[in-house]
Amino acid sequence: MLSLLLSLATLSALKSCEDGNSQCGSWSDGGECTKNAAFMKDTCPLSCGICKPPPLLEQTDDPLLGPERVVLQIQWGGSSGSSGVNVPPQYGEIVLGFYREIAPVTVEHILTLVRMGGYNTNEIFRVDRGFVAQIQGVEGGRRAPMSKALREVAKQTVPDEFTKRVSHTRGMLSMGKFDKPNTGTSSFSMVLGNAAFLDNKYTIFGRVVGGDAVLSKLEQVETKKEGIFVMPKERVEIVSAVVMVSDGNGGLRLEDCEAEKRKVEL
């Protein structure tokens, strides 16, 4: 078990290296790293090559990981104050890896939804510090309209796939469900602490392999209590979710079908 899990101390020790705006890549391509060096150093250190992020976890770190990855681009906050000063939204990327070996049905279901664009414009509706950050079900959280095909897949249920090989610790992906068995659909959580009491109640189907610093930032957002849920006061939006494939050396490439879609879009 210890060989599969990074300790909280190890995760917190990793130096954060991330862009603070979704436009950083475009700004960097336009030469802003040189033209506007001070601003870009603070806002876009990753795109400007000022720092390097911690390497993504690979199979050498966790043998249960399969090759697929999902990159979530999220943003939150931002406002236009009464003084006329605009506060830009915060931005970050979280990379998910998957345990096909222990939860094959759940993993394939989630990846299918991502490939269909199901999590684009969805939200992280629950942020309970030290417990979970939960992604809303596809049918309930999206701002964009849904196709009939997506709606059909989103309401499909998956069986519980419990195992003793992993436990609910920070970074694990845990499938949401109702009280009855085998009722998971499309909502899932990223675990933010040690929650072993969830073992054998909710399916663990993967883990966060990159972007723990972004999760730590999310834990600092202002929240409100609604029933049993601790929810962010402002919407935390998933701008996009894309399936990629690990190259085994800390890098990612577009999955073949995603690459073909990008060609069509261009």
Question: How should each PLM-predicted stretch be described?
Answer:
Residues 1-13:
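Cleavable N-terminal signal peptides of Sec/SRP-targeted secreted and luminal proteins
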Residues 12-14, 26-32, 52-266:
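Cyclophilin-like peptidyl-prolyl cis-trans isomerases
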Residues 2, 22, 42, 46, ...:
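Amphipathic alpha-helical interface elements that mediate macromolecular binding in regulatory proteins
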Residues 20-52:
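Secreted, short cysteine-rich peptides and small extracellular cysteine-rich domains stabilized by multiple disulfide
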